[in-house]
């Protein structure tokens, strides 16, 4: 369809990595997939306790092998997603050393840290293991430093962001196996958040009120957001956080911004100063 209509198309996938092989990577590349994100939640003990196979067998070694396959494959970028909470934060330093230049030397991969949150009713019992908003900036700053120590090229830099998430655009959706459509994947399966369905020709039909409610979210209409100095780098925050806290998409959805931006700026400036000093030497 895209070729016939001269539309540029690329995609990426998020996967646990256990089914990746050279044939799968070949097919992904053939269909313009340029990014594969694989989740790794700690060293073997921590990861295998969180992400075992259905039969209980460990998956850590298979995931590492899959990451290596992606790194060896041309035209596909590898992203390692590490989900962080209080139960595995101490394990993460060891993991970064294992992945880095002193271990498996997978430094060509990008690292993405996910802050675990108890964002749904099913996850509410896990809240005690999640970091408070006031703790996130210090946690991330420490992890950024560990990335650089272990040979990963990473310099956090605040960016102007009119939308907190791409799911506020008119071209990104979450589609479940029954062809129901949602905007945020955290809402998949919750009827009140379903925005429509996909018909046999791939069209979005049966749009619900939730679609228009989500798409009309405007942080400038919210007094707290409108007066907030973080708005240009936040875009009003996460709609899922907003709904979970206030039962509406139209409230502030502050997450991973306040306190983090300051750390990003300091980290970025310090790296620039260090680079300039080294160049002058």
Residue ranges and their predicted role:
Residues 1-46, 53-62, 82-94:
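Canonical radical SAM enzyme core domain
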Residues 7, 32, 74, 105-107, ...:
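Short loop/turn motifs at secondary-structure junctions
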Residues 45-68, 72-170, 178, 194:
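Radical SAM enzyme [4Fe-4S]-AdoMet core and its adjacent flexible, acidic
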Residues 178, 220-281:
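Radical SAM enzyme core and accessory elements
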């Amino acid at each position: 369809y895209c070729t016939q209509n001269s539309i540029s198309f690329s995609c990426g996938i998020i996967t646990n990595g256990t089914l990746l092989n050279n044939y799968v990577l070949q097919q992904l590349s053939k269909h313009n997939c340029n990014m594969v994100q694989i989740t790794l939640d700690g060293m073997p003990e921590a990861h295998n306790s969180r992400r075992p196979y259905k039969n209980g067998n460990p998956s850590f070694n298979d995931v590492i092998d899959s990451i290596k396959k992606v790194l060896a494959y041309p035209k596909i970028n590898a992203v390692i997603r590490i989900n962080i909470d209080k139960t595995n934060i101490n394990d993460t330093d060891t993991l970064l050393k294992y992945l880095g230049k002193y271990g498996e030397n997978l430094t060509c991969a990008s690292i993405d840290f996910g802050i675990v949150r108890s964002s749904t009713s099913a996850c509410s019992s896990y809240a005690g293991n999640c970091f408070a908003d006031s703790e996130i900036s210090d946690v991330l700053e420490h992890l950024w430093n560990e990335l650089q120590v272990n040979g990963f090229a990473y310099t956090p830099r605040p960016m102007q962001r009119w939308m907190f998430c791409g799911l506020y655009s008119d071209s990104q959706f979450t589609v479940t196996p029954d062809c129901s459509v949602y905007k945020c994947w955290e809402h998949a399966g919750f009827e009140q958040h379903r925005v429509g369905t996909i018909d046999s020709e791939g069209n979005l039909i049966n749009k619900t009120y939730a679609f228009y409610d989500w798409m009309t979210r405007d942080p400038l209409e919210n007094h707290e957001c409108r007066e907030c100095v973080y708005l240009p780098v936040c875009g009003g925050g996460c709609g899922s956080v907003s709904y979970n806290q206030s039962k509406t998409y139209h409230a502030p959805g502050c997450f991973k911004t306040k306190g983090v931006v300051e750390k990003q700026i300091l980290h970025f400036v310090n790296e620039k100063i260090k680079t300039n000093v080294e160049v002058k030497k």
